[in-house]
Every structure is written in C-alpha cells, then in structure tokens.
C-alpha cells in the first residue's frame, strides 16, 4: 500500500511570534505560535514544523520555552529548527518536546555534525533543511545551489549532490525550500523538488511557494515529494488542512 503523503503547516517564528515573509523579507505577523499550532493539531495536520528564523542569523538559540509550551498542546510530530549547532542543542530540543530537529546552516559548516547527530539520536529525528536557489542560466542544464543564513549566503554547493551527501551521513529526511519561490505563492520549484526526491531514498518535504491547493498536489504528483509544507495559505485562513486533504485525495493522493 502507498505511504500516505503528509501535509505540514510551517511556523516561521521571529522573537516568539509567527511571521511570514516573501523571499525571506517583508515580514508580516501571523500570531502566537502555540495558539496556531493547537489549531493545526485540531484540524488534523500530520505534523508541524517550527523554524526559529532569527536564530541562525543572530546566532541565537531556538527558544526552548516556546517549544515546551507547544509540545504540551500538540500531539502530532513536531520538527524544530533554527540555530541548531551542537549535539547539546539537539538534546535540549528533544527534551523540550520536539520529535525531530532540523539542521540547516550548521550542516554546511560541519557536515560530520549530521552524522554525529544521527548516530547519537537516530536518523528518524534528524532533518536536514536545504535552502536552494537556481543558478543555471536559461538553456543550461538546471542547477541549484545551497544558500545559508536565511538564504543570504551562497555556498557553491550543488543542491542535489549535497542532499545525497546528507542522506549518506544519516539524515532521515530533507526539508527542501526553494529560495526563488518562497512566499511567491505561484507553486513549488518542481524541478529541484523532483531532482532531489528522485535522487534520494529518504523522504523529501517540499517547501516554498504554495499559493493554492493545486500547488500542494503538484508537489507530490510532479515533484515526487513525500510531504508538502505550507505557511501563509493556512495561517491567513485561505484554506484549512481538511480542505487540503480533501483536494489531494480527490487528485488520487493517499492522505491520512
């Protein structure tokens, strides 16, 4: 039987508030993370992802207190990321109630950290977040590069090769955000989503660009992702999680 595809609302948290921006800029406030997480839990979301978007840029640690409050209200898997740099950071987040921890910038500077984390805590709770931007010129074979620090710093790393390396080191899942599409609401970058999903044996979560329910389905059917992540379409009430699941089921996608 086909594995159910997951719908994951994403909470980008800045100084304790859920925010949403366009291409990581022009931030607008969407509310209290614990309240919002509780709403998605009640709506039947499969998981919730909480990203402290200030953490890596400011070198600040993810707010454990918010994670504790959220974990006490939410009974679906919770992935937390932002400023995760050490084994102790991961232990603190798991102890606070996170089910999975997302590593982004630190993986680029120290890839072995991913292997160490997977050995210590198990691959099932280690997610590597990849922020990719298309760098190939029109007419060239498509190529995507990894960026860090909230999409500000290029690394020169090829996104598909990097994802394969992360899988080899023990990552259990890849959270793939297209920097070109983030906040644009005109769909995932299906090219990079498909390239990475097809290259790996671990689940890939598509992120960046959802503006309607068709985009979610396209991420699965055309992007070959295992899960789809969205923020603003849920936060600002355009669609609910049950509406998204009904739409995807109608397109022939197995949902929980």
Swiss-Prot record:
* Pathway entry: Amino-acid biosynthesis; L-histidine biosynthesis; L-histidine from 5-phospho-alpha-D-ribose 1-diphosphate: step 5/9
User: What are the GO cellular component annotations?
Assistant: cytoplasm
Where in the cell does this protein reside?
Cytoplasm
* Predominant cellular place of this UniProt entry's protein: cytoplasm
Active site residues per record: 12, 131
Q: GO annotations under biological process?
A: L-histidine biosynthetic process
Per its UniProt record, what InterPro entries does this chain match?
Aldolase_TIM, His_biosynth, HisF, IGPS_HisA/HisF, RibuloseP-bd_barrel
Against SUPFAM superfamilies, the record matches this protein to: Ribulose-phoshate binding barrel
Sorted keywords for this record are: Amino-acid biosynthesis, Cytoplasm, Histidine biosynthesis, Lyase
Recall the GO molecular function terms of this protein's record.
imidazoleglycerol-phosphate synthase activity; lyase activity
Keyword Cytoplasm present in the record's keywords: the answer is yes
Question: Which residues constitute the signal peptide according to the record?
Answer: none
Instruction: Write down the superkingdom of origin.
Output: Bacteria
Reaction(s) catalyzed by this protein?
5-[(5-phospho-1-deoxy-D-ribulos-1-ylimino)methylamino]-1-(5-phospho-beta-D-ribosyl)imidazole-4-carboxamide + L-glutamine = D-erythro-1-(imidazol-4-yl)glycerol 3-phosphate + 5-amino-1-(5-phospho-beta-D-ribosyl)imidazole-4-carboxamide + L-glutamate + H(+)
Q: What is its EC number?
A: 4.3.2.10
Q: What does this protein do?
A: IGPS catalyzes the conversion of PRFAR and glutamine to IGP, AICAR and glutamate. The HisF subunit catalyzes the cyclization activity that produces IGP and AICAR from PRFAR using the ammonia provided by the HisH subunit.
Q: How does it assemble?
A: Heterodimer of HisH and HisF.
Q: Which family does the similarity line name?
A: Belongs to the HisA/HisF family.
By what name is this protein known?
A: Imidazole glycerol phosphate synthase subunit HisF
